[in-house]
Amino acid sequence: MSLRQNALNAYRNGLRATRIAFGGDTRMLLASRAKMREGMENPPNPELSKEQQIKHLEDVATFLKRNLVQGRKEGTDEKYHLNIHKETELGDNESIKQTKKTLVSQGGGCCGGGKDLYK
């Protein structure tokens, strides 16, 4: 594929990603699409090669689809409805559940000063 075709495909994927991420929020949808168009016309990092700029746009589209979730406040209490869609990446948080093997987590304090404090 030509460079022009690759750029056009990346732009289209970016527009699709904004529709997925901001589907119910017209203001954000229009703002994100305007920002994307501006970035295509005047690249924010012109020192990068065209291929790197295309790759960056593809990465942004992937991030928008997988990692961005919008919430909308429901009612008067502090409850929000999250717009989680089929492409949202849901982590399992296993790394958070594991205990850390640092001195601080074992009661050692900063720089090991309290290492024998809890024995």
Swiss-Prot record:
Keyword tags: Chaperone, Mitochondrion, Transit peptide
Record carries keyword Transit peptide: yes
A GO CC term assigned to this protein in UniProt: mitochondrial matrix
Keyword hit for Ligase: no
GO biological process: mitochondrial respiratory chain complex III assembly
MF term (GO), any: protein folding chaperone
Subcellular compartments: Mitochondrion matrix
Signal sequence coordinates: none
CDD domains associated with the record: Complex1_LYR_LYRM7
InterPro entries assigned to the protein according to its UniProt record, in alphabetical order: Complex1_LYR_LYRM7, MZM1/LYRM7
PANTHER family listed in its UniProt record: COMPLEX III ASSEMBLY FACTOR LYRM7
Record's function text: Assembly factor required for Rieske Fe-S protein RIP1 incorporation into the cytochrome b-c1 (CIII) complex. Functions as a chaperone, binding to this subunit within the mitochondrial matrix and stabilizing it prior to its translocation and insertion into the late CIII dimeric intermediate within the mitochondrial inner membrane. Modulates the mitochondrial matrix zinc pool.
Family: Belongs to the complex I LYR family. MZM1 subfamily.
Assembly mode: Interacts with RIP1.
UniProt protein name: Mitochondrial zinc maintenance protein 1, mitochondrial
Organism: Zygosaccharomyces rouxii (strain ATCC 2623 / CBS 732 / NBRC 1130 / NCYC 568 / NRRL Y-229)
